[in-house]
């Protein structure tokens, strides 16, 4: 009898790490991969996020491990405190709530509330501008978005969402092309009043703007704004033919509606 107890205890000690690891695992779905901008890597069955800013990840392995990042996110929102960190990741909170996780109450975030109040979103419109020969980065046109406003009157009071490279503005055309093709620039999202965009593209550069309304549900619209807030604090490597304005907007829409898998259709290149 004592021998059987010894065997049982020995097996328990041997199996416990595996059991604990299995319990710690949380299934990573397409929604989480899209929310973290994770793409299949070139080295087998692994992932890497297109986001390069360290402040976007809670786990030290977060850029290359969506599972580790998911566990770190669950831990963050399951406990009290860390309000400042939580306020940077409202879309992740919404995602976890939708999956049924028991979480602590989301904190009051004044800057996030002001962001929503400034936008007063009522819809999202995809915009495409004509090519502009005086700017090498706009030779194929430019893709951006407009967050339509619920305010009465003109959409000039809406806000535009733009992804672009952060350049010094003083580079010559050759250096600009080399850096743009090889990832020499960082890129990021900016939100600005739509009348500024109209003034630049229509009035100054004399470019046409084509509009395509997106059929987002109210829940998807809210999630889009929340995720835009998240990635608005981040940067990515900018590549003219791959990680450009069109591609990053597709990744953002995939986060809202993962089943679209828009970015999957452009594994090699995406023309702006």
Task: Report the location of each language-model feature.
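Positively charged n-region of N-terminal signal peptides that target proteins for export
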Residues: 1-6
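Active-site-adjacent bridging/hinge elements
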Residues: 115-123, 136-138, 142, 215-228
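Glycine-rich catalytic cores of cysteine/serine-nucleophile enzymes that process amide/ester linkages
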Residues: 120-206
């Amino acid at each position: 009898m004592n021998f059987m107890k010894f065997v049982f205890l020995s097996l328990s000690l041997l199996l416990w790490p595996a059991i604990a690891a299995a319990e710690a695992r949380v299934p990573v779905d397409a929604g989480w991969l899209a929310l973290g901008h994770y793409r299949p890597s070139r080295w087998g069955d692994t992932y890497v996020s297109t986001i390069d800013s360290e402040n976007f990840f809670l786990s030290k392995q977060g850029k290359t491990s969506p599972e580790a990042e998911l566990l770190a996110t669950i831990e963050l929102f399951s406990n009290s405190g860390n309000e400042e960190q939580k306020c940077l990741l409202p879309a992740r909170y919404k995602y976890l709530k939708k999956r049924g996780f028991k979480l602590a109450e989301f904190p009051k975030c004044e800057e996030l509330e002001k962001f929503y109040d400034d936008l007063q979103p009522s819809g999202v419109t995809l915009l495409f501008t004509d090519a502009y020969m005086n700017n090498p980065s706009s030779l194929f046109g430019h893709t951006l978005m407009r967050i339509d406003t619920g305010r009465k009157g003109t959409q000039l009071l809406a806000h535009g969402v733009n992804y672009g490279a952060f350049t010094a503005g003083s580079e010559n055309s050759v250096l600009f092309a080399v850096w743009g093709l090889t990832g020499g620039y960082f890129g990021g999202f900016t939100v600005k009043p739509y009348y500024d965009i109209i003034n630049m593209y229509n009035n100054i550069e004399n470019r046409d703007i084509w509009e395509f309304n997106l059929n987002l549900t109210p829940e998807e619209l809210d999630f889009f704004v929340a995720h835009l807030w998240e990635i608005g604090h981040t940067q990515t490597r900018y590549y003219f033919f791959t990680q450009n304005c069109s591609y990053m907007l597709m990744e953002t829409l995939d986060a809202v509606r993962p089943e679209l898998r828009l970015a999957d259709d452009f594994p090699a290149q995406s023309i702006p």
